[in-house]
């Protein structure tokens, strides 16, 4: 069975022409055949059964917008784009006070290239590489807050779900099939909250995954749904029925005489009410022999995309199982415009499972960032893609040698990657002093490593800080990528809930059992919700963001050295533990640490040749991080009272 998104199939218009010429008759016949094909094969992306979430305000226009309406839309677009960048900040002052931040050690392992001339495979193959601690480790203290939980009202979610008839009917069928005495609230799990800051609307836009599990076990999902909430700069959810006037892409309708022409797109506006469930269509079947259902969108990640029509909009990527494809694949979705695209490599088949693609927006070529989205397809070994947003087709920018086409390493997924917050609000005089090599871009994120049998339960998941370095060779017009720095496990001092499962007692009663280091032990980083500079210190004087605009023109600042620059930057990282919650931790001063990393600022480490990726030992920093992660796992298990088995672990 197919759950369908809202669609509008237009009838053939009455042209008033009774005697068509042969050429027009051919065009008309071809149009009818095309329309018949669309209708009969629309089980995947279109259909008459609406999910009821995206309202009819998204029309397909058969004519160009009239001049008056165009002026109104352009006025709205101008107003959105002209918000005060110097007085917009994603965090209230109370979340920026020093006394709420504690210190935690972050240890990253940097680029090993300078140490590979005398590379000794035997020496470096030891379990505890001396090079890790002696040469590659770069430790520092970073500031972070206690985690803040970001809840959702289950009854409110169910109210929205019940108004979307296909979703509601599917869940009711599942309830009738999976007989269970569990209370309804025990069957629903919300986690994987991924968020971005919408400065034009002064709110945080969060997508999270609501999972329905009839037996109350998080990793026995029947179906998942994507839920949108809005939060203010205090990270309080905005009231129910909050409405935004959002921009979207309006597409012209089919026309007899424009069948083979690209459809024209226009910017328009509509009202959108929150919270809401995204109307993602998906296949489902009940029952199936394997009893492995897992229908619907999973693991959403989000970033902000600059639409060529002149507005910024969220772009969500997720993986989803399809009955037609008989496998899990990746999709992109534009919620403002209700546009869903399957993502696929242009000249390669699907792998057995497509998931954990790490999205980022390349800032090297701003004109292309409007139409493409980049991904780390694989971290070990490193493979990078660029995908066209309109078609979903992906080109390989950097492809490593892989012995197994379907290989997926332990390091994968995590948050999206973001560029350093050195945007146009930072004075150009300051940016010019920073020691980043020419034609280099730096992206950072929090990946996560999946370790099996490392000491705590069956498997452990924790965040790992990473930097992705992008070097451009203007002679060959080619981009090169590398993992510049990577940390071992870093848990943000967050509370990690034990994995929960339903078990029977001696009398046959079902109860919930949750113990640390039993089953999975999970803390997943889901998004960098924001990253911005609140103030800058120069030679001991602090300048707030609203001062950046005229710091130098007003004569407040004279000459200065790069080592006199101190950024007070703030980053929000959203987390989920045990597939059952959403929280956020605020991090302060990370930018200063990053700007000291040798892999980012050393000109001798600029990549401009393929051989760099073929030198033995080029991935030593990643290996060091994996060793450190395993040591964390053992240490964590010991603290939980687990007796460590010294058998070899597998990743």
Curated annotation (Swiss-Prot):
Biological process terms in GO annotation: cell wall organization
Membrane topology: Single-pass type II membrane protein
Coiled-coil regions listed: none
GO cellular component, one term: membrane
Residues that carry a glycan: 271, 423
Induction annotation: Expression is induced by HAP43 and down-regulated in an azole-resistant strain.
UniProt GO molecular function: mannosyltransferase activity
Predominant location: membrane
Swiss-Prot/TrEMBL keywords: Cell wall biogenesis/degradation, Glycoprotein, Glycosyltransferase, Membrane, Signal-anchor, Transferase, Transmembrane, Transmembrane helix
Extracellular side, ranges: 43-651
Residue stretches spanning the membrane: 20-42
Side of membrane Cytoplasmic, spans: 1-19
Function comment: Beta-mannosyltransferase involved in cell wall biosynthesis through beta-1,2-mannosylation of cell wall phosphopeptidomannan.
Similarity annotation: Belongs to the BMT family.
Name listed for the protein in its UniProt record: Beta-mannosyltransferase 7
Lineage summary: Eukaryota, Fungi, Dikarya, Ascomycota, Saccharomycotina
């Amino acid at each position: 069975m197919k759950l369908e998104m809202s669609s509008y199939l237009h009838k053939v218009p009455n042209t008033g022409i009774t005697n068509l010429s042969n050429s027009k008759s051919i065009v008309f016949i071809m149009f009818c055949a095309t329309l018949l094909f669309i209708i009969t094969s629309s089980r995947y992306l279109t259909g008459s059964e609406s999910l009821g979430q995206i309202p009819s305000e998204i029309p397909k226009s058969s004519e160009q917008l009239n001049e008056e309406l165009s002026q109104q839309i352009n006025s709205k677009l101008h107003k959105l784009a002209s918000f005060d960048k110097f007085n917009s900040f994603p965090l209230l002052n109370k979340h920026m006070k020093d006394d709420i931040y504690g210190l935690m050690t972050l240890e990253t392992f940097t680029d090993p290239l300078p140490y590979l001339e005398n590379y000794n495979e035997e020496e470096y193959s030891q379990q505890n590489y001396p090079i890790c601690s002696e040469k590659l480790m770069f430790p520092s203290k970073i500031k972070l807050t206690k985690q803040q939980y970001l809840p959702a009202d289950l009854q409110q979610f169910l109210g929205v779900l019940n108004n979307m008839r296909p979703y509601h009917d599917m869940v009711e069928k599942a309830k009738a099939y999976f007989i269970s005495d569990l209370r309804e609230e025990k069957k629903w799990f919300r986690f994987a909250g991924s968020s971005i800051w919408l400065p034009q609307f002064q709110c945080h836009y969060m997508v999270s995954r609501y999972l329905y599990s009839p037996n109350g076990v998080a990793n026995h999902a029947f179906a998942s749904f994507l839920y949108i909430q809005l939060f203010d700069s205090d990270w309080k959810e905005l009231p129910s029925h909050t409405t935004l006037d959002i921009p979207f892409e309006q597409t012209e309708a089919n026309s007899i005489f424009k069948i083979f022409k690209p459809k024209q797109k226009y910017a328009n506006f509509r009202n959108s009410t929150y919270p809401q469930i995204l109307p993602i269509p998906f296949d489902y079947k009940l029952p199936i022999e394997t009893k492995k259902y897992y229908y619907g969108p999973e693991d959403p990640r989000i970033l902000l995309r600059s639409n060529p029509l002149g507005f910024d909009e969220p772009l969500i990527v997720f993986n989803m199982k399809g009955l037609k494809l008989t496998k899990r694949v990746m999709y992109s979705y534009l919620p403002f415009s209700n546009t869903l695209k399957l993502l696929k490599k242009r000249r390669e088949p699907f792998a057995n499972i497509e998931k954990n693609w790490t999205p980022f927006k390349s800032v090297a070529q701003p004109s292309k960032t409007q139409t493409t989205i980049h991904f780390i397809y694989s971290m070990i070994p490193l493979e990078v893609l660029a995908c066209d947003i309109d078609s979903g087709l992906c080109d390989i920018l950097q492809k490593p040698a892989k012995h197994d086409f379907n290989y997926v390493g332990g390091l994968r997924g995590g948050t999206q990657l973001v560029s350093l917050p050195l945007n146009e609000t930072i004075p150009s005089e300051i940016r010019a002093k920073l020691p980043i090599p020419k034609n280099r871009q730096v992206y950072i994120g929090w990946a996560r490593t999946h370790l099996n049998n490392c000491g705590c339960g069956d498997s452990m998941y924790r965040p790992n800080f990473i930097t992705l370095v992008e070097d451009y060779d203007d002679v060959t017009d080619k981009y090169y990528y590398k993992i510049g720095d990577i940390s071992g496990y870093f848990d943000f001092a967050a509370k990690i809930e034990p994995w929960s499962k339903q078990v029977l007692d001696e009398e046959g009663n079902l109860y919930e059992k949750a113990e640390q280091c039993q089953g999975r032990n999970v803390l997943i980083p889901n998004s960098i919700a924001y990253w911005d500079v609140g103030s800058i210190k120069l030679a001991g004087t602090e300048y707030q963001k609203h001062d950046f605009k005229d710091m130098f023109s007003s004569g407040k600042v004279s000459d200065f050295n790069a080592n006199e620059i101190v950024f007070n930057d703030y980053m929000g990282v959203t987390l989920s533990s045990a597939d059952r919650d959403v929280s956020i931790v605020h991090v302060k001063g990370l930018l200063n640490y990053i700007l000291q990393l040798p892999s980012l600022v050393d000109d001798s480490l600029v990549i401009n040749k393929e051989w760099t990726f073929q030198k033995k030992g080029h991935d030593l920093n990643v290996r060091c991080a994996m060793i450190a992660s395993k040591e964390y796992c053992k240490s964590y298990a010991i603290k939980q009272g687990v007796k460590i088995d010294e058998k070899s672990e597998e990743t």
